[in-house]
Every structure is written in structure tokens, then in C-alpha cells.
Amino acid sequence: METKRVEIPGSVLDDLCSRFILHIPSEERDNAIRVCFQIELAHWFYLDFYMQNTPGLSQCGIRDFAKAVFSHCPFLLPEGEDVEKVLDEWKEYKMGVPTYGAIILDETLENVLLVQGYLAKSGWGFPKGKVNKEEAPHDCAAREVFEETGFDIKDYICKDDYIELRINDQLARLYIIPGIPKDTKFNPKTRREIRNIEWFSIEKLPCHRNDMTPKSKLGLAPNKFFMAIPFIRPLRDWLSRRFGDSSDSDNGFSSTGSTPAKPTVEKLSRTKFRHSQQLFPDGSPGDQWVKHRQPLQQKPYNNHSEMSDLLKGKKCEKKLHPRKLQDNFETDAVYDLPSSNEDQLLEHAEGQPVACNGHCKFPFSSRAFLSFKFDHNAIMKILDL
């Protein structure tokens, strides 16, 4: 079925071609891929200015616009080349260009900033864009985020803190920017590229395309977040690791250990955001799949004095001299407890592990092992072939 051709006035195409295409060097003008990039710039100008100031003009996508330009200036198309083939090659080339951007988190680390494209069917995603020639990744991320949100992350960005994925053979790296106030004013610097900028609760965003969480909690289908979905699970892993280094009860983990618990104001006041700090201490930057620390299954103690009494009792029972350990083989274990610090939590009588705040030694000997003896006759029978 033949598609309807977009009608753009010749005067408009003349102006756009003179602005963006005809002035480029001849060696670039002979390269159809390079011409397509210039046509893309002309298309943005057409949407930003002509569409806004000239009623009645046809709104069109980049493919239809490029066809109109090649039809208006056929000398731009290499001899014998098909327009559709050139556009397909250009699309494939663009997919190989890395994209850089940022994941902006609020002060509670519960919400993330997403942007929505200008077109009606556009979904929500993180602010990012393609890198320019000889542009550093972090500079590209700062430029794209500023263009799409009006917020400058140059003073917040850390070159080593990012999540990096390869999606359909295209590299995408998002730098993590935590601690941005929710009342920050965002305003896109480009026309007709970003329609909306909003904070979203991370726990309400989908981890995969069949995750119906946003449908039930936001009233939005999961495909509205298809650009953000690949980064949600790595982001949750990052949050788990961020608050998983403490061994106390306020360690930021939920009871399951699979998703981070909501950080409290008190906790965040203790956590200073140092953007030069390595946020992936146990893996390389951008390593998004992390193994969660398993919370210790420990027997609760009602108060400090209860634990202290227990430890004192243990020390009274196990006062052993290093040279007389043989006299105590009937006991189950040997505890070498530092007597000067009762704040160190040790293993109690039933063998249930608890957290240890200091350096504790646990020389342990099994009763079965200590009474073990080789059966010499049985061994010799085996060797007697």
C-alpha cells in the first residue's frame, strides 16, 4: 500500500536546505549518511519554527521529511541509490552511536526524574542523547541532560558512577546523580523535543515489559516506560548496594533483601552524598547486576544487658589455658573472647550467628573431629589389591 506523500512548500525546503545542507563541504555532501544527519537538523528546525509559526504545514516524522528533501534536491542522493535503503543504512548507523545521559534521584532516593518525548505516542525515559564526534562521555551526558531538562549536572557528575547497558547493539550509559531536591525547577532548552518532565516513584516503575505495576499504581501501561525499563532493575540493585554496607538494623534492606527499604530522613542525614566516591566498590563501574548481601538470621536480644550477661556467663564457663585445651575436649567449642569490650556481639550458646562490631576470634573444634581416628586395618585392606 502506497503511503501518502507529505507536502512541504518548496520555499520552505529551499530555506532549510540552504541553512543546513548545501553549505557543508563537498566530501560530506557526497556521503549520504552525513547528509541524513544534516537533514535531521533541518527537520528539528522545521518542527521548532516553521510548524509553530506557519499554520497549515504538515507535521511529519524524520523519514517522510527526508524523502521530501531528497525529492526536492535529487543531487543529494547518490546515483542509483534508493531512498529507503539510504534511510535504513542511516538508522542502522545511528544505532551504533553511543548515548549518554543521567539518572537523577531525589534526596530520599525514592524518586527518579523521567522525561517524555514531544510526540503524542512518546513514552517516558531518562534524559540522554547521542555523543558528538570527539566528545567525552560525561560531557555528552551533561549537555544532553541540560538540553532536555535545563538542569546542569556538571557539578554533580562523577565519571566513575554510572550504569551502562548495550541495548540492540547500542551502548547506553547513564551517570547516577543522587540527592537533587524535588522542588528543583526543570525547563527544557530545546523546542518540541520534550513534552513533560516528572518525578516517578521507583517502586512504581516496571522492571520488564510484562510488569503491570505502573498500570495498577500509575494508570499507565508498562510500554509507556519501554526506554526506562532496562535500567530500573540495575538502579534498584544500586540502591540496595548503596544501603547494604551497614551491618546494623538500619541497613536499608527490606526483609526479603530483594529491594531497598525506604531510606529515612535520619539515615539520609548520616549519608553524605560524595559524588567523587566510588558507588560500585565490589565491581567495575557500570556493573549493574549485583548479588545482594543476605541478611543475617539472628536470634534477637531484648537489650544490651541481656547480651552482656550472656557473654559474661560464657567467659566464666570457658576460661581455658592455651596449654590445657586437651582437658576440655568434652566441650563443643572454644571461644576466645576479648574481655575488654562487651560491645562485640558474639555467637551464643545455640550457635546462632549474630553481627560482630569488632574483630573477634572463634577457634572452633568439632567434638566428632577431635575424637576422630584412622582405621588402620580397613585402610590396609583397601590397599591390598
Swiss-Prot record:
Biased composition (Low complexity): 249-259
Reactions performed catalytically: a 5'-end (N(7)-methyl 5'-triphosphoguanosine)-ribonucleoside in mRNA + H2O = N(7)-methyl-GDP + a 5'-end phospho-ribonucleoside in mRNA + 2 H(+)
Enzyme class: hydrolase
UniProt cofactor note: Mn(2+) ion is required for highest activity. Can also utilize magnesium ions.
The UniProt record lists the keyword Iron: no
Subcellular location: Cytoplasm, P-body; Nucleus
Enzyme Commission number: 3.6.1.62
Keyword Cytoplasm: yes
Gene Ontology BP terms: deadenylation-dependent decapping of nuclear-transcribed mRNA; histone mRNA catabolic process; mRNA catabolic process; nuclear-transcribed mRNA catabolic process, nonsense-mediated decay; regulation of mRNA stability
Location (main, coarse): cytoplasm
Pfam families with a match to the protein in the record: DCP2, NUDIX
Required cofactor(s): Mn(2+); Mg(2+)
Subunit description: Found in a mRNA decay complex with LSM1, LSM3, LSM4, EXOSC2, EXOSC4, EXOSC10, PARN, XRN1, CNOT6, UPF1, UPF2 and UPF3B. Forms a complex with DCP1A, EDC3, DDX6 and EDC4/HEDLS, within this complex directly interacts with EDC4/HEDLS. Interacts with DPC1B, UPF1, UPF2 and UPF3B. Associates with polysomes. Interacts (via N-terminus and C-terminus) with TRIM21 (via N-terminus and C-terminus). Interacts with LIMD1, WTIP and AJUBA. Interacts with DDX17 in an RNA-dependent manner. Interacts with ZC3HAV1. Interacts with APOBEC3G in an RNA-dependent manner. Interacts with ZFP36L1 (via N-terminus).
Its job: Decapping metalloenzyme that catalyzes the cleavage of the cap structure on mRNAs. Removes the 7-methyl guanine cap structure from mRNA molecules, yielding a 5'-phosphorylated mRNA fragment and 7m-GDP. Necessary for the degradation of mRNAs, both in normal mRNA turnover and in nonsense-mediated mRNA decay. Plays a role in replication-dependent histone mRNA degradation. Has higher activity towards mRNAs that lack a poly(A) tail. Has no activity towards a cap structure lacking an RNA moiety.
Family of the protein in this entry: Belongs to the Nudix hydrolase family. DCP2 subfamily.
Name of the protein in question: m7GpppN-mRNA hydrolase
Lineage: Eukaryota, Metazoa, Chordata, Craniata, Vertebrata
Recorded name of the encoding gene: DCP2
